[in-house]
């Protein structure tokens, strides 16, 4: 299944706020109206919607998300929490959380077009897994820096999560540590996502 490129508001109206996909928010009460017209959700549908929420927020294909679930399942610790850590430490998501892009798809474009360096080297793979002490910088090029400066100016001021530091004037971000669960930027029940996949096998 390919990455979603359809109407974004349609997704957030059904699944709730997906800040990585779009800065728009569903209107207050729209979910309640939808629920009043529909029958009670099955457990399968509840798990499916949590999975879809994760997939659309981080901009993943079904195959990519399944791969991350399998990696998380083999790691030590809670599969759900490891899954969120893997997704949050992707380079495209780190740029989004730093405010260098308004959405994750926008961050992905910055990476694909060679505007971003990690530890002094251009990285053009959005799924690159960042590690503690990684230094993310914008290429020392007028076009790259003007582009990112415009995005920084456009982004709503939000408190940075503890695992990141931003040096705006140097166009530089620092990964301090692996993200804590409480700093994940999406309202999600990751256990339902793990359950969804465990029941598919």
Curated annotation (Swiss-Prot):
Highest taxon of source: Eukaryota
A cellular component annotation (GO) from this entry: chloroplast
Entry-linked PROSITE patterns: RIBOSOMAL_S4 (PS00632), S4 (PS50889)
A Pfam family recorded for this sequence: Ribosomal_S4
Biological-process GO terms, alphabetical: ribosomal small subunit biogenesis; translation
SUPFAM superfamilies assigned: Alpha-L RNA-binding motif
A Gene Ontology molecular function term of the record: structural constituent of ribosome
Ribonucleoprotein in keyword set: yes
Location within or outside the cell: Plastid, Chloroplast
UniProt domain S4 RNA-binding: residue ranges: 89-152
UniProt cross-references to InterPro entries, sorted A to Z: Ribosomal_uS4 (IPR022801), Ribosomal_uS4_bac-type (IPR005709), Ribosomal_uS4_CS (IPR018079), Ribosomal_uS4_N (IPR001912), S4_RNA-bd (IPR002942), S4_RNA-bd_sf (IPR036986)
Predominant cellular place of this UniProt entry's protein: plastid
UniProt key word Transmembrane helix: no
Keywords noted in UniProt: Chloroplast, Plastid, Ribonucleoprotein, Ribosomal protein, RNA-binding, rRNA-binding
Role description: One of the primary rRNA binding proteins, it binds directly to 16S rRNA where it nucleates assembly of the body of the 30S subunit.
Assembly and binders: Part of the 30S ribosomal subunit. Contacts protein S5. The interaction surface between S4 and S5 is involved in control of translational fidelity.
Entry-linked PANTHER family: 30S 40S RIBOSOMAL PROTEIN, SMALL RIBOSOMAL SUBUNIT PROTEIN US4M
Family affiliation: Belongs to the universal ribosomal protein uS4 family.
Protein name as catalogued: Small ribosomal subunit protein uS4c
Encoding gene per record: rps4
